[in-house]
Amino acid sequence: MLMSAYAHYRSRDYEKAISSAQEYISLHPGGDGAPYAYYLLAICQFDQIIDVGRDQARSDLALLALNEVTARFPESDYARDASLKTDMVMDQLAGKEMEVGRYYLLRGEHLAAINRFRTVVTEYQSTTHVPEALHRLVESYLSIGLIGQAQQTAAVLGHNYPGSNWYSDSYALMQGQGVELPAPPDAKAGFNLFDRIGKLVF
C-alpha cells in the first residue's frame, strides 16, 4: 500500500498518493511505515505549493501536515526534513503577506499595509522577510504621521539587523525627520535565515 502511495507520488498523482497514504494510516496507525506515510502526506502538499502571487491554501495544508510529522515523530529523519520544509513554507506565507502589504502601501492604504507587515513581524519571525517588513512599517508609520512608532520600529530593525540594507533605508528616512538612530555599519551584512531564527528584540 505504501509502495502504491509512493508510486503515485513519483508520477505526481498527488490525490491518489494522499488517498493511499491515508488508507495505510487508518489500517496500520502504529505500523513501521506510519512515519513515512505521514511524511508522504506532507510532501504531497508541499510539492503542490504555488508562487506567492496566488492563493496559499496549499501552503497552509502543507504546514499542518509537516507540523504533524515533527510532532508525532520528533526523532526521525522525516521530522528533520519536515522541519526544514516548514521553514520554507513559513517563508512562502510571509512572502504572500508582504506582497499584499506592498499593494496596500502603493495604494496609500497605510493601515491595511501596517496590519500585513505586522503579521510578518509577529507570526513569521524566522523568515527572510522580517527586515523588509520592519522597514515597510517605518515607511507606513511616517506616511500617517506616527513618528514615534516609526522611530521605535526603526530602532528594532537596527538592533536586530544592523547591517541590512533595509536598516540603511530606514535610517535615511528617520534622519530626514530629524530623528537620530545608531548609524548603520559601512559593511552591508547579508541576511542569513538560520542565524536569525528566534525572537526579535523590542
Predicted features, each with a name:
Residues 1-202:
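Acidic, polar-rich low-complexity tracts and alpha-helical solenoid repeat scaffolds
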